[in-house]
Structure formats: C-alpha cells, structure tokens
C-alpha cells in the first residue's frame, strides 16, 4: 500500500470514528431523563427558571430527553450544591441550579462547603441576579429617607449565609450604608420570603428584580409592596426613579464593598452546573442546548409573560468570573468575610 492510499484510508477511518462518536452522543439522551436539582423552594425565581427550561430545552438536546425538576432546599442552596458535587453521578443526566456565590463562601472559609466550586462543570446561566429591595407598605417605610430615619431595625428576610442574591445583598447594604436592618435568615426560597413579608413576619426582602417583578407581581402592582432600593450599577429600565445603593455610599470603601460584594457576583448567582467528571462531550451537548433554548421564541415569550428577565451567561464567562473571585485582594476579602459570615 503506497503512502497516498495509506493516508486516504487513515482519513476515512477517522471520519468513521468521528461520525460514530457524534452518533453515540446524539443517541445517548434518547429515552433518558435529565434532572435539574433546584436548591430553593417551589414557586420562587430559581424554580420558575428551571421549570421553564424543563419545558423548552429538550427540543434542543439530541434525542429529546425528558427533563424533570426536583427541589432540594436547605442552607441557601448549599445542600443541593454539595449533592451535585459529591453524590450526583457525573453522567450528564443531573445538573444543579444553585447559588454560584458559594465561590465567595469557599474563599472565605464558610463552614459546610464540601466542594471546590472551580471543579464544577458549568453550563452557564439563563439570568443574572441583579437585585432590588422591596418593603411592605405595612412596614411604614416606602422611601430611603424614611428608612435612614427609622428608629427600629427593618426586618429583612434572606435564605441563608452564602446565598448570594439575598444574604449578601442585605448584609453588604447594612454595613456599607449603615442602614438599620435586622437580618432574618433561614428561608428556603423567595416564595417563603414573600409569604413571610405578606404575613408581617418580616418587613421585606431582596432578590433578583427580573424574578421579583414576575413572582411578586400582584403585590407590586397593588402597592402593598414597594421597591425602595436597587443594588445594581445602573437603574433597571422599569425602575427609573428608584435610587441605587451605591449612590448612598459615602466612602471609597463603602463603594468597593457594594461593587465586589453585590455587583460582581451577580452574573454567577444563578448557576447551572454539572458534577465534576461529567464527560466533556455531554457537557457540550447541554451547553449548546441551553444556548439555543434562551434564543427560542416560545421560551422568550413565556419569560416575558411571567415578567422574568433573561440575561444569559456562557459557561466560559461564568468560569472566568469564578476564577476572578479567587484572585481578589486579601484585604477586601477579609472585610467582606467580616460582614457576610
């Protein structure tokens, strides 16, 4: 066999192998069931996004598997993150939807972290967790002027230490702006915090505005709940008159705490991730499926109807942000640790 023929045979062989591998992946998900493990309670923002994905993402995964949503609450989604890292099989059939802010928790040595967040196989995110703080009308406080003048601390609910999007926002705002706040933590999700606020157990709470405006829509429209503060770099288009937290920061340190304690982690808060060791080809199939889903007209229409904003984050961008957290200046991390834990 001369060299030209040998090269041709080799090329054909590799083409057959490649086609077989591609066919294997396209067939892998056929007839299978994928689980999304949500770290928060049913009825909240994380849960709503996961259930939307379960309805629309299968059409963009070869083999069109069924996708089911399971809620595993506890410790601000820490229990679910630990489960995905340590228990879930790395077979491409289970991924988690939990707080990516645990990257900060790991750097700061929070107890209960049983994973290295850098080793998760990231899929990305459908939305960012850019937050607003809302208080009930019954609390008697409907403006920042009233809040700064309050004689007693305002009770704000959070899901738990390390749960970025609720806990970090409340604690950083309290420290940076010297606001009278009493943190009431331990709620299983935003749905539970809504109920607590409406019953008078707490005065208000915070989570991503793009989720809040959909899941707390009736109370916001009726005026029984009022947004008093935005914790984002720029105002949301539909909240042009609500002030920004950073505009009340009186020192460079206060601004830095808000920037790195709230703004920076917002893109990784609503993490979607697979267990370490998941085959790369299966992860790529799911990443592509996710990217196609967020562009799907029916998915977008459902999100619009529910008033849930979409702001996709790629797996690569998420990993870069996580890696960046591990490179933050030690002095800043020490200050944040003293505030958050």
Model-derived features: positions:
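Bacterial N-terminal signal peptides
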Residues: 7-20
């Amino acid at each position: 066999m001369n060299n030209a023929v040998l090269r041709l045979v080799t090329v054909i062989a590799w083409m057959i192998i490649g086609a077989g591998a591609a066919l294997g992946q396209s067939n892998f998900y056929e007839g299978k069931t994928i689980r999304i493990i949500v770290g928060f309670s049913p009825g909240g923002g994380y849960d709503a996004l996961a259930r939307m994905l379960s309805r629309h993402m299968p059409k963009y995964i070869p083999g069109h598997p069924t996708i089911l949503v399971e809620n595993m609450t506890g410790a601000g989604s820490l229990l679910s993150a630990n489960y995905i890292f340590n228990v879930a099989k790395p077979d491409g059939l289970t991924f988690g939807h939990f707080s990516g802010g645990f990257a900060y928790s790991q750097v700061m040595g929070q107890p209960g972290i049983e994973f290295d967040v850098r080793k998760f196989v990231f899929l990305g995110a459908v939305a960012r967790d850019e937050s607003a703080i809302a208080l009930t009308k019954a609390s008697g406080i409907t403006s920042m002027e009233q809040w700064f003048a309050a004689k007693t601390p305002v009770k704000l609910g959070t899901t738990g230490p390390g749960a970025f999007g609720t806990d970090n926002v409340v604690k950083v705002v309290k420290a940076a702006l010297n606001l009278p706040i009493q943190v009431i933590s331990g709620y299983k999700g935003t749905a539970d915090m809504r109920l607590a606020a409406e019953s008078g157990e707490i005065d208000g709470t915070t989570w991503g505005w793009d989720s809040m405006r959909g899941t707390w829509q009736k109370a916001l429209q009726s005026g029984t709940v009022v947004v008093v503060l935005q914790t984002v770099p720029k105002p949301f288009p539909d909240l042009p008159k609500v002030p920004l937290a950073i505009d009340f920061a009186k020192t460079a340190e206060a601004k830095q705490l808000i920037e790195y304690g709230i703004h920076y982690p917002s893109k990784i808060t609503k993490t979607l991730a697979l267990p370490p060791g998941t085959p790369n080809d299966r992860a790529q199939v799911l990443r592509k499926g996710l990217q196609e889903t967020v562009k799907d007209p029916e998915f977008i229409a459902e999100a619009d109807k529910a008033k849930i904003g979409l702001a996709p984050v790629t797996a690569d961008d998420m990993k870069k942000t996580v890696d960046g957290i591990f490179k933050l200046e030690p002095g800043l991390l020490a200050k944040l640790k003293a505030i958050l834990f």
